[in-house]
Amino acid sequence: DSYIAFHGNDCYFGTAAKKKMGTEGYQVVYELKRVIGLDEDDESIDEDKEKWPFKIVGNDRGKACIQLELPFNGETITRTVDPEVLVAQYLNHLLEERVENRLRCKAVFTIPAKFSNVQREAMKSAVNQLRLADVRFFPEPTAAAMAYIRESPSIVDNSCIVVYDFGGGTFDVSVLRYSH
């Protein structure tokens, strides 16, 4: 669960953050992938803005940012944060739990095939904040095809692999030709 919950100076991630939904004094954000790299007035998030318990505001460049209302010492502090920063914070939390030496860590990140170049660059910006040794980015269906090839020893040289991704209202396709 890609949830982050804030309460004063405290921060919770994943399931622990999701459990804070609706709890007084906690600000919970999620679905950051739907916001990252977009302009504040992008129509693709208009419906989402109505259901999210957090506000989307524009920064000085018109980019969509998350506005947090955080209780602190009896007052409410308003903080505006770029989605890239929050994505990096979430990924950083995951790495702290699982990776001993980041400077040796190799990682593959998948990016939705429907992302624009601006959204892809925003995701790369978030990941680059993690200071990993070797990072690769692939569209989600391409990564699925590569995983299929890796896990299928029966694939012969010069095979054609087609992966259809029917997720989330999109229809994405990757076609790969495999050769040793």
Please name every model-derived segment:
Residues 1-47, 55-60, 71-80, 96-180:
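Oxyanion-binding/catalytic loops of NTP- or PPi-dependent enzymes
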Residues 52:
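Internal, Lys/Arg-enriched amphipathic helical interaction segments that engage polyanionic partners
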Residues 87-98:
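Short, well-ordered amphipathic alpha-helical segments that serve as non-catalytic structural scaffolds
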